[in-house]
């Protein structure tokens, strides 16, 4: 309620803010779904052709150590929009989550089933300053009443409660109906969302705007245009799925069309473009464990606290701010995007967990800090409940089932192959103490023993 009162007070100045907003920085945030750190050519993958994203990296800054605040989707999305860790928003697992008793010896806390209206989103922060805003694509942060329009966006195109793309009769293809987005038979979802984004840019070229473009692609069930799939089948090498590769190509095409629309509108010099993914790459699809992508050299993938589950590709093009072609290895998090946009718009970010990345983009540095994760759930991908901290080159994971610790030096061991917890006990103990103190400071909900767990049944599979 306090947030709503605050925003209502600001709304009285909206007209004057819009009149004063000419020339203000625009923001385009493109979010891929389940897209791996290694799924871009500019990140060293020779299999995928991503010329538009590679060009964006050449024109802007590419981050090597960027992280999602959670190894699954909904919590990271909330962190992007609020600048707050999942443990604070209460969205700590994908919505609606799964019953914990199905999996293991501990009962995990329930995740919130929506991003609360009391949270202040970046759209609500920018709106009173004269910004128009649209969410075009996947929302997955609650049922009706908690959709983008309820969270400060002026427009919602294609976003609802669902975490998956339309799949009937064919994944990603019409006919389907999403909020303010209808598709006839055979129309391709990624193209429809891209066109809606391009149209929004064209309508708002004279006003400052926030375009949040969270694509459904490359989330399963996989679906792509037949001609694109055929091209990739010809070069399939067993490590990558040709349908997935075709989806990556369509995502790259979308980025190219959005960049072209920015150029055509004549606003490239005052538009900051972000490209990011909500969690690590999905390695396998379905009960048959059909390969989807390969996250090497990172360990594991979506749903896991290892690097393959949380390290993401991040590209930011900020004309007049960053030197083209910059590569940044400072660890950053999805909680940092909210304060970055606020700083670029000349606004106070308020009480958030993230920090502005503008100093890094300008060639400077950030104050030393630790990054934190709290994922007290069993994931659909086999990930186990735990939490983690990264400080400098060091990363420590605590597993909630048995309290065991794993310590890695990521500079020397990006694949997390050698657990150093026993040989670097002082480092492990210090990082663990920091992690425990952080969890207490944010009132993290912790797992409890599972009374329904039967180890003998788990061992026999009965």
PLM feature spans:
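Short, structured active-site-proximal loop/turn typified by the sulfatase FGly-forming signature C/S-X-P-X-R
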Residues: 46-78, 83-88, 132-134, 154-160, ...
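C-terminal cap/loop subdomain of S1 sulfatases and analogous C-terminal strand-loop tails that border
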Residues: 155, 281-305, 322-326, 330-410, ...
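A short beta-strand-to-alpha-helix junction
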Residues: 45-50, 67-72, 109-120, 183-193, ...
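N-terminal secretory signal peptides and thylakoid transit peptides that target proteins
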Residues: 1-14
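Loop/turn elements at helix/coil->beta-strand transitions in domains of secreted/extracellular proteins
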Residues: 24-27, 60-64, 129-133, 154, ...
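Long, internal low-complexity/basic segments
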Residues: 7, 23-25, 32, 36-37, ...
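Histidine-centered active-site microenvironments of extracellular/periplasmic hydrolases
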Residues: 147-152, 221-224, 260-321, 333
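Formylglycine-dependent
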Residues: 91-132, 139-211, 215-226, 230-245, ...
